[in-house]
Every structure is written in structure tokens, then in C-alpha cells.
Amino acid sequence: MEFAHLTVLSLFCLAFVGITATSSEEDYWQSIWPNTPLPKTFSDLLIPSGKTNSLPIKSEELKQYSTLFFEHDLHPRKNFILGNTNSVGSIIRPFTKSRQGVTDSIWLANKEKQSFEDFCYSPTAIAEHKHCVSSLKSMIDQVISHFGSTKIKAISSNFAPYQDQYVVEDVKKVGDNAVMCHRLNFEKVVFNCHQVRETTAYVVSLVASDGTKTKALTVCHHDTRGMNPELLYEALEVTPGTVPVCHFIGNKAAAWVPNHTADNLCVM
């Protein structure tokens, strides 16, 4: 299926009041889901902000994306320390793809070459479909078109600030083949939305070392043939295409999956 359409975000079917989105974005949301106020999770993603570094993912989120682990590690009482890989380029794009003779991991390390066009129009990985959008309306339209329904679940993370050590409290499977939309670290609002086939999304309830309870959107890749072999060996001592590999998703992102149990949007 062409990736020109996406899906919508949540975990427990709760209504959250949005406070920062423009009226046009909020009105459009209400026209699609009149019984669900715009979640604060989404309104926060729409806040314009100046770049704090030259990378397309904010530096404070890199440890979340760079924590790689096995699917069988997702169980209560499992301990995680965020950040088990060191390559910035590989953290942002764990799938290797040649680009004019230079791999993405090397290219992304060259901070002066970061741009919307470079990141959004770089080659796709194996089994990946991606598309960049610059508004919530475009994201909603694409997600609904992709899934063919407004019955969708939207999920996001809420990692605690300044906390790197967590223990798993609970794990819930959300769905397969989710559409992921990442807010990129550009001055204007830009989302990089993509779907990688043969993936499973989970919501993992975590407790930080200071007792703060959080939840982490987690994606497990069952087809890892296109993953960076150096990254996988550094983190897990495995090779691409052998075992499922999982990673956390940072706070500035959302996953969309079909909702088969309710008649409206479910936000988790």
C-alpha cells in the first residue's frame, strides 16, 4: 500500500483537553471526532520551537530511541537504563541506507547538512513507507486514509525528565504495523510519519528510580534485515535478520493503529 495516509493516537480511551493548538487545527479535530477533545499530547506537538541542536531529533530524546532490547525483555520487574548505543546517526535512523555513497549514520553526524529535504526525502529502508507532513490536519487525513476508518487508537510516551533508570510495571500490546509520526526538531512544525512492516507496538508502564510513574511507547521490529549491523552488534551482539529488536519512542512522537473495540478515537 502506498504510504500517503496515516492513523490516530491513544492508549486508554480517555478525553484530554488541548490548550495550545490553533483554533483551525482544533476545529478540524472536532469535526472528525466531535466527542473527543484535542488531547494535550497532540497540542504540545504543535508548539513551534527554535532548534536546540542541529539534529532532527531533540538531544534529550536520543537516549530513549537508542535503548535497544529484545522483545522477551518486555515483562514486569525488568530494569532498563536508557541509552545503550553511542552512534547519533544510527540512533536516529537504525536502518542503513546508502546515500550518494555515504551511509545515513555518517551523513547525519554532519550537523551542517541537516534540512527538511534531506531528512524527509532520503531513501526509505526495507519495507518502510514514509511521508512528511506540516500540520495536524494533514496527519489526520493521511492516517484516516491509510486505515480507511476514523476508528483509531493514538499512543504516545511520557518519559519523566532527567530520569534514565526505569523498572517495568506492566506491558500492553497496542497493535501491529503502526504508523509512527515523529515531530522533527525544526523551527517549523514538521512530522516524519512512516510505517515499517512486521512491527508490533506496545505501551509499557514504567517506574523511574525516583518513583515517578510513566508510560513508554515501544516498537518491536520483527524484520531487522535492513538494520545497521554495527548498531545491533554494539547494543545486543546480534546480526540483522535473526531476532526481533525493540526500542522506546521519545515523547515527541505518536503511533496510530486501528481501534477494533470502540466506535471513536481512543487516546492512550
Curated annotation (Swiss-Prot):
First and last residue of the signal peptide: 1-22
Keyword Magnesium: no
Sequence repeats, residue ranges: 50-55, 83-88, 101-106, 166-183, 202-222
UniProt tissue specificity: Seed.
Glycan-modified residues: N259
Segments of this protein annotated with the region 2 X approximate repeats: 166-222
Pfam families: BURP
Domain of life: Eukaryota
Sequence segments annotated as region (3 X 6 AA approximate repeats): 50-106
Keyword Signal on entry: yes
Alphabetical UniProt keywords: Glycoprotein, Repeat, Signal
Residue span(s) of domain BURP: 68-259
InterPro entries named among the record's database cross-references: BURP, BURP_dom
Protein name: Embryonic abundant protein USP92
Organism this protein belongs to: Vicia faba (Broad bean)
